[in-house]
């Protein structure tokens, strides 16, 4: 039978509930438990797919093609789980489902209300996603007291009552700020946050108190007194240099022991040796490289969260500190390639629309002509193909129909049709809704024998996640290959271009997929490890 941990947050947003939950999940998994993690988001969007990265950060794509919250990326990086569409439940999705049922007459003429119809649907999502796990950890987005989150809070309160206290646990994250003028930590915000939580019927079993310094025992006792949480369950959530230290931080304070005792479990002790090796590799690198990331969302680096982490994971594998130099593509176009001076590799990540495209084209040209390692992801592949067509093939008007619908040289064009992972034919055109109309999820690709990408993967098949609408136009493929660009990967039906390389270049690869979504700190990812290794080789040659 699955047992449930519900994680809520109070005082302020952005306390790191996702990281905290994932870190606890990693410890519990190390104790031999099967863990799954679920995110409940109170916004009305059906999914974050059409939200601006400046509003929401990265859209994390699951194996089955759901566009989800970036916290699911944390879950998959910390815990050995494969998230699905049911592991991220938004208010918009819940309301849409309930309204659709009402229109079909499923409620048999009843008045449809928040309680029980909305709250029951939320609970159904939780129970469905939790199947097969020993412990399901459920993070509720937002802050206690937000009007948007009330249906979700009520849903988990009801579920806790139905399942019983022995099978449910509530963990609340709060902030304990240090007031420099007074020279002390203040516990009052935490007291009031728990009071708000208790007013809706939820008594927390554990508090994780975010602070920039250790919380003294007398302050923990004070928090315990006013919140009805045992002092030993008041945990210091200290800020750390890197997030992969957090499992050890929590284990030292006995967080996992509190969970195991609460649920009455008899399991082995956690061995976090692998996590300790990760932290040691981060803290004691033997080398250092600088990678330029050229994009248009660089002022909010969470827009590239999984890519950032994948590069850091590759650094771990290469015993290398990876410094990411974020370069705004519009600045690059206006100020020139001096912004790329001294970098050891260049990556152009995914994106949509035509803003900043010219700067990305300039970055690709610089990498190609200066023989600097280049990795293009999704849009980064398309940019590389257009740049090659313009400056090598001499097709000066080469463009994407995403940037110019009337272009007479559509090197990149709309994906009109493909077969999805379920074997169903998907069709798209420009008149369709934006939301949920991309080529999404993990899709297999065949790699050309002897290609660099096949060597890196150690296989002639790869299966990475996608999120795009546009593809390389098949009418230009022969000309591209004749000029020196190799199409080294195609979708399993040999239809769509998945990977391109320039064999004459030291390391130049573009992928239509998003391999960053499957990189983990413990396992890394072969593509990014090879990319950072190439950056090291280039640096050695550049400095010699």
Swiss-Prot record:
CDD domains recorded: CTPS_N (cd03113), GATase1_CTP_Synthase (cd01746)
Instruction: Check the UniProt entry and state the signal peptide residues, or none.
Output: none
Residues binding Mg(2+), per UniProt: 71, 139
Q: Tell me which UniProt keywords the record has, alphabetically.
A: ATP-binding, Glutamine amidotransferase, Ligase, Magnesium, Metal-binding, Nucleotide-binding, Pyrimidine biosynthesis
A biological process from GO = pyrimidine nucleobase biosynthetic process
Residues where L-glutamine binds: 351, 379-382, 402, 469
* The UniProt record lists the keyword Ribosomal protein: no
Q: Which reaction does it catalyse?
A: UTP + L-glutamine + ATP + H2O = CTP + L-glutamate + ADP + phosphate + 2 H(+); L-glutamine + H2O = L-glutamate + NH4(+); UTP + NH4(+) + ATP = CTP + ADP + phosphate + 2 H(+)
Q: Which GO terms describe its molecular function?
A: ATP binding; CTP synthase activity; glutaminase activity; identical protein binding; metal ion binding
Positions bound to UTP? 13, 186-191, 222
| SUPFAM superfamilies cross-referenced by the UniProt entry | Class I glutamine amidotransferase-like, P-loop containing nucleoside triphosphate hydrolases
Record-linked InterPro entries: Class_I_gatase-like, CTP_synthase, CTP_synthase_N, GATASE, GATase1_CTP_Synthase, P-loop_NTPase
Q: Which residues bind CTP?
A: 13, 146-148, 186-191, 222
Q: List each copy of the Glutamine amidotransferase type-1 domain by range.
A: 290-541
Active site positions: 378, 514, 516
Question: Which EC numbers characterise this protein's activity in its record?
Answer: 6.3.4.2
Could you say how this protein's activity is regulated?
Allosterically activated by GTP, when glutamine is the substrate; GTP has no effect on the reaction when ammonia is the substrate. The allosteric effector GTP functions by stabilizing the protein conformation that binds the tetrahedral intermediate(s) formed during glutamine hydrolysis. Inhibited by the product CTP, via allosteric rather than competitive inhibition.
Q: What class of enzyme is it?
A: ligase
Please explain the role this protein plays, according to its UniProt record. Catalyzes the ATP-dependent amination of UTP to CTP with either L-glutamine or ammonia as the source of nitrogen. Regulates intracellular CTP levels through interactions with the four ribonucleotide triphosphates.
Q: What else is known?
A: CTPSs have evolved a hybrid strategy for distinguishing between UTP and CTP. The overlapping regions of the product feedback inhibitory and substrate sites recognize a common feature in both compounds, the triphosphate moiety. To differentiate isosteric substrate and product pyrimidine rings, an additional pocket far from the expected kinase/ligase catalytic site, specifically recognizes the cytosine and ribose portions of the product inhibitor.
Quaternary structure? Homotetramer.
Q: Which family does it belong to?
A: Belongs to the CTP synthase family.
Its name, as the record gives it, is CTP synthase
């Amino acid at each position: 039978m699955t047992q449930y941990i519900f994680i809520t947050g109070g005082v302020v947003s952005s306390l790191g509930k996702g990281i905290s939950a994932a870190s606890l999940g990693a410890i519990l998994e190390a104790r031999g438990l099967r863990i799954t993690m679920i995110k409940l988001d109170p916004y009305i969007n059906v999914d974050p797919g059409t939200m601006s990265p400046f509003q929401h950060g990265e859209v994390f794509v699951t194996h089955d093609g759901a566009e989800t919250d970036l916290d699911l990326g944390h879950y998959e990086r910390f815990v050995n789980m494969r998230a699905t569409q049911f592991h991220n439940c938004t208010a918009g999705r819940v309301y849409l489902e309930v309204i659709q049922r009402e229109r079909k007459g499923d409620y048999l003429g009843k008045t449809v209300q928040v309680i029980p119809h909305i709250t029951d649907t939320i609970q159904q999502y939780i129970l469905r996603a939790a199947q097969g796990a020993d412990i399901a950890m459920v993070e509720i987005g937002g802050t206690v007291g937000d009007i948007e989150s009330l249906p979700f809070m009520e849903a988990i309160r009801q579920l806790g009552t139905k399942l019983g206290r022995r099978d449910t646990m509530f963990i609340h994250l709060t902030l304990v700020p240090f007031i420099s003028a007074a020279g002390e930590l203040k516990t009052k915000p935490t007291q009031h946050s728990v009071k708000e939580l208790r007013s809706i019927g939820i008594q927390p079993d554990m508090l994780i108190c975010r602070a920039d310094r250790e919380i003294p025992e007398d302050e923990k006792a004070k928090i315990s007194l006013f919140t009805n949480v045992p002092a030993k369950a008041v945990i210091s959530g200290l800020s750390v240099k890197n997030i992969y230290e957090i499992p050890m931080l929590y284990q030292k304070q006995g967080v996992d022991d509190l969970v195991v005792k609460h649920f009455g479990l008899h399991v082995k002790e956690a061995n976090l040796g692998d996590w300790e090796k990760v932290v040691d590799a981060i803290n004691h690198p033997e080398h250092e490289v600088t990678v330029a990331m050229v994009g248009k969302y660089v002022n909010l680096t969470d827009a590239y969260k999984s890519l950032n982490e994948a590069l850091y994971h590759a650094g771990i594998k290469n015993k290398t500190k990876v410094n990411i130099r974020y370069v705004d593509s519009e600045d690059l176009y206006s100020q020139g390639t001096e912004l790329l001076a001294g970098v050891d590799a260049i990556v152009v990540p995914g994106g949509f629309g035509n803003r900043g495209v010219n700067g990305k084209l300039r970055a690709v040209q610089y990498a190609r002509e200066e023989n600097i390692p280049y990795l293009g992801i999704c849009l980064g592949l398309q940019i590389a193909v257009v740049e090659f067509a313009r400056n090598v093939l001499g097709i000066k008007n080469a463009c994407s129909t995403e940037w110019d619908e009337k272009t007479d040289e559509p090197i990149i064009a709309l994906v009109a049709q493909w077969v999805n992972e379920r074997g169903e034919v998907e069709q798209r055109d420009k008149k369709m809704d934006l939301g949920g109309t991309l080529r999404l999820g993990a899709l297999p690709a065949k790699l050309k024998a002897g290609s660099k990408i096949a060597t890196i993967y150690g296989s002639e098949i790869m299966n990475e996640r996608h999120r795009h609408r546009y593809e390389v136009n098949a009418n230009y493929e022969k000309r591209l290959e004749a000029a020196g660009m190799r199409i080294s990967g195609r979708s399993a039906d040999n239809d769509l271009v998945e990977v391109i390389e320039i064999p004459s270049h030291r390391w130049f690869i573009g992928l239509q997929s998003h391999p960053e979504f499957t990189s983990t700190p413990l396992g890394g990812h072969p593509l990014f490890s090879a990319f950072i290794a190439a950056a090291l080789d280039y640096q050695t040659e550049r400095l010699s």
